[in-house]
A protein has these predicted regions:
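A glycine-anchored, Pro-Gly-centered beta-turn/N-cap motif
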Residues: 109-116
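Short beta-strand-plus-loop segments that form exposed binding edges in beta-rich domains
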Residues: 118-122
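Primarily secretory-pathway and cell-envelope proteins
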Residues: 1-78, 123-161
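A general structural signal for short secondary-structure boundary/capping elements
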Residues: 96-98, 112, 160-161
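Short, solvent-exposed coil/turn segments at beta-strand boundaries
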Residues: 45-47, 90, 110
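Extended, solvent-exposed segments with strong compositional bias
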Residues: 73-108
Length: 161
């Protein structure tokens, strides 16, 4: 019997204020940050997401990915949001920043997911990306109040803005 991997950990070198998750080819236009994108800490396009990791400079951090049926909050989260993520091409699933990248090895299939993004801090900063399969549209929003201006329930704008 083949074991399907439902979790993955990536030691990612994060730089240029971005962690990207995508299921399509690189597109410079989809990487652009508008004033609202900067304020909310995310650029949201179908199959192409960019998150602000918050800390400045280049640094290494663990990014913990999971595919689950139900989202479970990390008690160490400092920021938490959910955004829609469309897997457009499972063969192009990547996690990256400017200086490093990794293939997403989770068994994500073409279709819609709720992607939960958490910035967590214990002894070190780490990130969690949790994919939950969804049939309905997912409203991008903050899920907790945070020290960078996020307010629980507040909607996040999609696209360049």
């Amino acid at each position: 019997m083949q074991h399907t991997k439902m979790t993955q950990e990536v030691d990612l070198t994060i730089s240029h204020h971005q962690i990207q998750v995508r299921s399509r080819d690189f597109d410079e236009e989809l990487c652009q940050w508008g004033e609202i994108n900067i304020k909310q800490g995310a650029v949201i396009h179908p199959g192409y997401l960019t998150f602000d990791p918050i800390p400045d400079d280049a640094f290494g951090a663990w990014v913990k990915l999971a595919l689950t049926e139900v989202f479970t909050e990390d008690p160490n989260a400092q920021r938490r949001m959910v955004v829609p993520f469309d897997v457009l091409d499972p063969g192009k699933l990547e996690l990256l920043s400017v200086m490093s990248d990794a293939v997403i090895e989770l068994p994500l299939q073409e279709g819609r997911y709720a992607l939960y993004f958490e910035i967590c801090e214990d002894e070190e900063v780490y990130y969690r990306l949790t994919f939950v399969r969804e049939e309905e549209y997912v409203q991008a929003r903050y899920l907790m109040d945070d020290e960078w201006g996020g307010r629980a329930g507040e909607a996040l704008a999609e696209g360049y803005c």
